[in-house]
Amino acid sequence: MRILGIETSCDETSAAVVEETGDAAKPWSIRSNIVASQVAIHREWGGVVPELASRQHIRDICGVVDRALSEAETAWEDLGAVAVTQGPGLVGSLLVGVSYATAAAAAAGLPLVAVHHLAGHIESLVLQNGELPLPSVVLVVSGGHTSLYLVEQPGSYQLLSRTRDDAAGEAYDKVAKLLGLGYPGGPVIDRLAKTGDDRAIALPTTRLTHADRNAPELKGDLDFSFSGLKTAVLRHVRDLESGAAPDEPRSRAPLPDKTIADIAASFQRVVVTALVERLFNAARRYQARSVGVAGGVSANSRLRADLKERGERREIPTFLPSLALSTDNAAMIAAAGLRRFRAGQIASLDLNADAALPLHDQRPT
């Protein structure tokens, strides 16, 4: 069976065709995966502008779907279902994908499958590597999310922890903007960090020991927090630029390249250490047989290297998506859609977007 996946949760318009392989160990194969990025549009504004994003999705969606079907050598009558990201994300962006998918499914007489965006990221690990040894602890880390999930059976995701404030990718973008490095910040900080001294600056690591009152069901000690780190970088930069107190006017004189590289390296070391430590602490606590990292920040070179090194030291298998599957894409949505379709989880054609959709609402029944 082949399924069409559609992803428009933020600023990438993507469509993909994924098919079942008949191999239980590696159940899915990508026939096409088309992504139209809006980075050039939003770079001018220093971040994603929701109104611009949704308008660009409208311009791109038909052509992207046509390209995905053409590259996959697949006609509408060859498809078994249509899968679409229902949420979470930017509501205007989500509505474009959901509206297209519901109309297409109705016109073609195909079942519609609603997919949670983070479930797609988790299933990107299976799409890339085959079924993971379970139970597995998966870190989903991106510009909008930083969470740990326990996967005890295929298609079931239990939230273990989350960020209390900024997502890791969001912190990267904010620090990059502070340093005048442009948007998106993750790739440029990763590149500059390779030339910097990651011990040049003493930056704080937040260690939480209490439960979040907004999520009392979580223990709290596995939660993340990056706002304090971001503020520490801000104070350090202001001191360097103006030689004044943090609340005094800052100088416009640019920082030396070496200083910026040292800040990038020190910041990245603290972020990656926090991510990897909590991931493996969770793996030990829940006796996981594997760990994985998914989402846009999983493309970070230091995170990939540290994950591999820690996994080898702990003698636990580690899994990552390819770089192409790290960022938002429709192939992962199609894969998650196939999982839900086989579980009998079909959506009605009056499906609506949900910008704050909880992942636990989409557990298998």
Regions found by a protein language model. Name each.
Residues 84-110, 301-310:
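Short Gly/Thr/Asp-enriched flexible loops that form oxyanion-binding sites at enzyme active sites
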Residues 114-115, 307-333:
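Conserved phosphate-binding/catalytic loops in two-lobed NTP-binding clefts
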Residues 2-78, 84-88, 117, 121, ...:
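N-terminal beta-alpha supersecondary unit
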Residues 13-19, 138-140, 146-150:
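Short beta-strand scaffold segments in enzyme catalytic cores
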Residues 33, 194-291, 302-309, 313-314, ...:
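A contiguous, well-structured pocket-lining segment that forms one wall/lid of small-molecule binding clefts
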Residues 110, 115-137:
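Conserved phosphate-binding catalytic cores of ATP/NTP-utilizing and phosphoryl-transfer enzymes
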